[in-house]
Each structure stands twice: as structure tokens, then as C-alpha cells.
Amino acid sequence: MDYQPNNKALPAGSLGGLIGNWLNNNPWLRDESIIKGVYKDKLTASLDKADKNINSTVSRKLLNGDRNIENIASLLDNWVDNHPWAHGGWVPGNVDWDEFITNLDQSDAGANPIQQVREEIMELVRVLLETVSGKTAVEIGMGRCGGSHYLWSLMFDRVVTVDVDEKLIERFKYEHMPSSKQSTFIFGKSFENNIADEVGRATHHCDFMLIDGDHSRDAVETDWRTYNHLVEPGGIIAFHDTIKVVPGELEVAGFVQDLESGAVTGNPVPMRHIHKSKFVGISYYTV
């Protein structure tokens, strides 16, 4: 990626100096040409102008020619390979649900930095890069490590995330310092009216939505009915875990099938499926 380095020295004791030291010594920022280069220059450029809290100034979004699938894949691989505490790698695509659950490591160290199969999520990234503007993304459910929020922040000006676990949100904010201008986190149950109202205040519309919260059939339908109106024409609504139905555990596929057949609204919804694994999968449609 091409970028213009900022060579202006920052005093060692300044906020900029401290952040530069953090970037240089952070164990999981390994790709210097992409992460340290781009983000450190963004940080120092902003902090040269004003000594502000980093959370209020710096967007992770890749701009212009840098916003391509190769750079996003490289950054996401770095996220997975060098996460500070979650070392479970990508979700495996070649195992079935029963085997996955039997061998699941519930510890922090065993967590997947992003709860996705690589081939599936990168195919969705390709679709998004080709079809949507990259203005605003809304996701219902952020996962244990916030990997999907991190991914969308590379691609969109604004990312609004709703999750029921406040501790996960606060941990992500503490560890990764997302820009408050780019990232909005809403804590609560997505189906509650006050949470839906808060999402509506955060953004009146979006060009991408991922529904990946409670995986019960009724909850998925409620999330879809509550939030689908936010997605503008030409935008994309995606669902995660759409291959396998496991009663009481994975019921997203049942709703997606009903939506596709017309059983939900009376009109069939043309659905595209990214199914490159045994039990995970992503399905989406264009509004």
C-alpha cells in the first residue's frame, strides 16, 4: 500500500509518543508495512494537530486503492494469527458440528479471534467490496473477540454493533481502542424496543447488515423484522451459520430457508449462499 510517512518527531512523553511506543512494541501488530505504517502515520498525523484522545480521532478504514481484498485479507490474517490472547485460529471448515463442539476449548486462549470460516468470510468481503459503498455497517452480535467489528472497520466509515455482553464490548474497546467516530457499541438485547430505538438514533440507514446474534429461529426472525428497514436499496443483509440446523443451538438456516421460499413474507427472497464448510455458512440477499 502507498502512504506518505510522517517524519515529524513526537516528544517521548507526549500522547503521540506513548502511542507510537505502543504500536512499535505491541506483540500482535506484526505486519509493519500495513499495520504499523498505515495506522502509525494516521495516528501521528492526527496527534500533530491536536493532543486528543485516540478513541475520538482515528478510523481504521482503508481508503481508495488500499481498500481491496488483498489488504483486508492480510490484516485479518494478522488479527487471527497474532491476537493478544485468543489463539484458536479460524473456525475450521472441514469438521462437522458434533466434532467442533466436542473439541471446543472454552478458555480465552482457545477462542477464535473471529468466529468465521476464512473462505466464507473472505467471499462475503469480495461481494461487499464489489457492491456496496462502504458508508455504514450494522451488526447484531459481535462475537467473543469482536473480530467481525474489526473487519467491518477496515471497510466502512461507520460500524454499529449490538451485543448483549457488555464485558465483551468493554474488553474490545480497552484492548483495541476503536475510534468513537467510526465505532458505535450498543449494549443490550437486540429485540428490546429501547435497543432498537438506540440503533435508530445511531444510524438512520446502512448499506450492510449482518445478523449474527441469538441463533434461535424466533430471535433471528425478530432481528430481521426489527432492523431490515435500515438497509437501503442496493444494500446487503447477511446471516451467519446458515448451513446446519441443530435444534436449540443453530436455527438460523430454518429462517433463511423460509425467507427464501416466501413463507415469511409471502414473496420469495432471492438468497445467495456462501457455503464452504460443513456447518457454518453465510447467506445474503440484496435489498
Predicted feature locations:
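A short alpha-helical cap/connector motif
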Residues: 1-210, 214-287
